[in-house]
Every structure is written in structure tokens, then in C-alpha cells.
């Protein structure tokens, strides 16, 4: 998936040879810069791998959680309101209607 989109690997960067000209760049500076790029590539590759694994785990957890959710019963809003009213009467008694 990702390998199709990325054109360079850390190994490609490491093994790249540049021709030198009369007034070319200092090879030591280029090597240091390429070393930094290689480290970044390796870090990015590792981070992508970890995120892909985490993504798979989360998808599995979501799938399992959706399977565990109970099927809703045929309780209607009227039933809920009736139960709530009975509970209020039981808890508050006549205080609820006196005020």
C-alpha cells in the first residue's frame, strides 16, 4: 500500500552516489544531510507501521463492540415516561404535587 506511493527507501538514499564536479558540494556535508534524511525515513516508516497496527486493533475492537451491543427491546417513550412518573411518586410522594 505505502510502498507503491513512496519512491525512495532509506537504503536507496544510503546507496545513492553523486558525481562530483569542479566546484561541487562538500561530500562530508552531503553525507551528513543524507544521514539525517535516512533517519527521518526510518522514523516515518516505523511510525506508519505502528499506526497501521493500531488502526487494525481499533477496527477489531469496534467490530467486537458492535457485536456485543444488546438488541433494543420494544420499550416505548410512553413506557419510560410512565416508569419515571411512578418513580417520582415513590421517591417524592406528595411533596411533588404540594408545591
Curated annotation (Swiss-Prot):
Signal peptide: none annotated. InterPro entries: Cell_cycle_GpsB, DivIVA_domain, DivIVA_fam. GO terms for cellular component: cytoplasm. Pfam families: DivIVA. Transmembrane segments: none annotated. Keywords: Cell cycle, Cell division, Cell shape, Coiled coil, Cytoplasm. It is found in: Cytoplasm. Residues 34-71 form a coiled coil. Its main location: cytoplasm. One of its GO terms (biological process) is cell division. Forms polymers through the coiled coil domains. Interacts with PBP1, MreC and EzrA. Belongs to the GpsB family. Divisome component that associates with the complex late in its assembly, after the Z-ring is formed, and is dependent on DivIC and PBP2B for its recruitment to the divisome. Together with EzrA, is a key component of the system that regulates PBP1 localization during cell cycle progression. Its main role could be the removal of PBP1 from the cell pole after pole maturation is completed. Also contributes to the recruitment of PBP1 to the division complex. Not essential for septum formation. This is Cell cycle protein GpsB. The gene is gpsB.
Amino acid at each position: 500500500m505505502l510502498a507503491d506511493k513512496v519512491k525512495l527507501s532509506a537504503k536507496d538514499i544510503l546507496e545513492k552516489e553523486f558525481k562530483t564536479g569542479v566546484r561541487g558540494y562538500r561530500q562530508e556535508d552531503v553525507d551528513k544531510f543524507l544521514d539525517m534524511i535516512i533517519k527521518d525515513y526510518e522514523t516515518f516508516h516505523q511510525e506508519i507501521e505502528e499506526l497501521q497496527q493500531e488502526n487494525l486493533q481499533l477496527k477489531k475492537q469496534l467490530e467486537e463492540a458492535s457485536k456485543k451491543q444488546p438488541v433494543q427491546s420494544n420499550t416505548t417513550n410512553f413506557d419510560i415516561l410512565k416508569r419515571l412518573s411512578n418513580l417520582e411518586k415513590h421517591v417524592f410522594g406528595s411533596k411533588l404535587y404540594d408545591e
